[in-house]
Amino acid sequence: MRYCLNIEELFQDIDFYDRFKAAKEAGYDNVEFWGWNGRDIERIKHECEINQINITGFKGDLDWSLCDLASRDDFIEWTRKSVATAKYLGCDSIIVHSNSIFEDGSSDYSDQY
């Protein structure tokens, strides 16, 4: 079993990239975080290397849905990019949801097709 910290929720008082070191100093070898978009992937890799931290998972989807024909291609392309990013970071899993959630909390596209 691997224990990991979600550095998105912990150490919020310090810069995101400094949280890898903080996790190591707290005694952990594994971290997870939410999305990788908008983040400096090279810096994440560097922080993992210098702090000997592994990434066990991150969110690999955005607001598109595999169930929505209008955004399916975007969803698939982003998932491919997420897999490539995970491989680059040495991460062996990503979290991908098949549906985006509407503002009312639903995710049913059946009325559109």
Task: List where the protein language model places each region.
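Acidic (Asp/Glu)-rich catalytic clusters
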Residues: 18-25, 39-59, 80-90
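Acidic-and-aromatic substrate-binding clefts and catalytic sites of carbohydrate-active enzymes
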Residues: 10-14, 30-43, 64-73, 102-105
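Active-site acidic/histidine proton-transfer and metal-coordination neighborhood
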Residues: 69-113
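Hydrophobic faces of well-ordered beta-strands that scaffold small-molecule active sites
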Residues: 2-7, 31-33, 53-60, 94-96
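A short alpha-helix capping/helix-coil boundary motif
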Residues: 1, 22-25, 60-63, 99-103
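Conserved, mostly hydrophobic/aromatic
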Residues: 5, 23, 31, 48, ...
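Short, composition-biased local secondary-structure segments
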Residues: 6-21
